[in-house]
Amino acid sequence: MKLKDLAFIGAVVLLLAPFFLSNDLYAAYLACNASHPYLMALLKFGILSTAGEVIGLRIKTGRYNEPGFGILPHAVVWGFLGVWIAAMMKTLSIGVPAVAESFGIEGVAAAMKGELTPLKFIGALLISLTMNTTFAPVFMTLHKITDTHILNNGGSLRALVRPIPMRRIICLLYTSDAADE
């Protein structure tokens, strides 16, 4: 483990420690999540998902950043993806139980608000199935397209305002995936 790794771990500990040490700060965090879920999703995904990408880069290349990677553009994109994820979680957590009830599985919506029961487990399974078969493929495709666009723009913040050449990127990804098979 290198000094940079220890510094990264130290920064994470310093960032998270106050939430474990102060009940008031943690309560304020929970209240903020409840009253501003989409703003908090933007911030949390912008920070945590970008940290995950930086860790992935460290594992792959041995560095936390490199020319063309674009930490800031990744953070902005992840922030907006986080808002989209939060909106989909809200939509699916209400919509899927309603659809399940329209198919005759009575009580799913109420079960989702209570303690763990077999019906709540079924509801959670249906929500997960719906999310993973409808939202996830579109999400992962868009995520790959935005990553490619950031890379194609040299990791610059200009990637955030330049039009994304969707067709070209999709064709590039499709042909490179076909070549891997």
Model-predicted regions and their roles:
Residues 174-181:
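Conserved small/polar residues in nucleotide/adenosyl-binding loops
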Residues 61-90:
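Hydrophobic/aromatic-rich structural module bridging two neighboring secondary-structure elements via a short loop
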Residues 37-43, 123-135:
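Alpha-helical transmembrane segments
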